[in-house]
Amino acid sequence: MKIIKKIMFLSIIITTISTYVHADLPNPGMIIDPERTAIVITDPQNDFLSPKGVTWGVVGKSVKKNNTVENIEQLFKAAKENNLPVFVSPHYYYKHDHKWKFEGALEVLMHKIGMFNRKGALTTEDFKDSGADWLKRYKPYIEDGKTVVTSPHKLYGPETNDLVLQLRKQGIDKVILAGMSANLCTESHMRELIEQGFEVAVVTDATAAAQVLEGDGYEAAVVN
């Protein structure tokens, strides 16, 4: 039964990854080896995925359209049921991060609206149920003592945290990637992991992005 469940799980993942493929681009596919493959989730936090989060006004429609919250949970659940390793790459800002001498436009915005704010690296004061905290329904999966929570990335990609090191130390060279947001942290993680020699597949309905007057971040991520 366990083997059957594992095969079903891998089939679902492959199907989900393949739901959005441009007709003129080849689909290289991915042979998933459970011994070498991990699920990586970027920013599964309230500020992105909760209606109370500071970005919900621009990401909410995309999250709902893709059933992102539910689909990320399905990834967590399936991974845990099949003993596939899970890594979470979170986004936190501490007080010292607000003292940067120069910032990009989105950094200014994130700091202005208090996105992912924490009191400090060594305290959980005011952390519970804050915008930086995990979405409540994900906590049983993330806080089970098995999920690897990396150090926080500060901008978009894993260049500023220890995700690559943690993956390599676990013998992982294949990554199934999901999380928030599609055209920023998720895409940046994808590109850097590929540059680092990992084989990466993105679950396209387990992510979402901002929709603003200038365009749809999710569509931009899929096209790129």
Where are these regions (language model features)?
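Bacterial N-terminal signal peptides
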Residues: 8-18
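Short catalytic/ligand-binding loop motif for oxyanion handling, primarily in non-cytosolic enzymes
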Residues: 94-98
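Active-site-adjacent betaalpha module
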Residues: 23-38, 47, 65, 78-82, ...
